[in-house]
Amino acid sequence: MAENENTKKRNRREEILQALAHMLQSSDGSHRITTAKLAANVGVSEAALYRHFPSKTRMFDSLIEFIEDSLISRINLILQDEKDTITRIRLILVLILGFSEKNPGLTRIMTGHALMFEQNRLQGRINQLFERIEVQIRQVLKEKKLRDGQGFSYDESLLASQLLAFCEGMLSRFVRSEFHYRPTQEFEARWPLLLAQLQ
């Protein structure tokens, strides 16, 4: 019986988070989302929302945890499965852009647009996530010298920030275009431009 209650509670939590992500994807996402609007969207009372989450901040925390877990775990898989530096970089970029494309509502969180009206701590978590990804990209670039005996013409820190800035720009464009301009759009055409910097 207790197991059924826990499953129901978990399902309701997921339903609330999915509703929030969906609202972030819709035109509601460009404005502050209130718990009243969210409760109406889920079809429950505000009190019911607070039975599952102590605050809206905690809901955003849960969505950010999902973003972190999804990206970092997959980056780790790429690093585990692939040894070629350029292949690793390409796959990491495609992962970030593809994740964004599949999760438009979460992209508003990743770009900070959805967090403008929320606690600063949430933006700090997103900043830390991107810093962590940049560190991983920089490490991949540095390992080339160890593996191949030859590094890049440019400093690895500069290259890592440039590659991540490209991703962040594509994510911002996705949000700005109301999700019409897909982050992976024209990636094949853009890749040689990025690759030219990795000499």
From Swiss-Prot:
Gene3D superfamilies: Tetracycline Repressor, domain 2 (1.10.357.10)
Record keywords, A-Z: Cell cycle, Cell division, Coiled coil, Cytoplasm, DNA-binding
Pfam families in alphabetical order: SlmA-like_C, TetR_N
Residue ranges the UniProt entry marks as DNA-binding: 34-53
Domain HTH tetR-type, first and last residues per copy: 10-71
InterPro entries noted in UniProt: DNA-bd_HTH_TetR-type_CS, Homeodomain-like_sf, HTH-type_TetR-like_transc_reg, HTH_TetR, NO_SlmA, SlmA-like_C, Tet_transcr_reg_TetR-rel_C_sf
One MF term in the entry's GO annotations: transcription cis-regulatory region binding
Stretches assigned to coiled coil: 120-140
Major localisation: cytoplasm
Compartmental location: Cytoplasm, Nucleoid
GO CC aspect terms: bacterial nucleoid; cytoplasm
GO biological process, one term: cell division
Complex formation: Homodimer. Interacts with FtsZ.
Protein purpose: Required for nucleoid occlusion (NO) phenomenon, which prevents Z-ring formation and cell division over the nucleoid. Acts as a DNA-associated cell division inhibitor that binds simultaneously chromosomal DNA and FtsZ, and disrupts the assembly of FtsZ polymers. SlmA-DNA-binding sequences (SBS) are dispersed on non-Ter regions of the chromosome, preventing FtsZ polymerization at these regions.
Family: Belongs to the nucleoid occlusion factor SlmA family.
Protein name per the record: Nucleoid occlusion factor SlmA
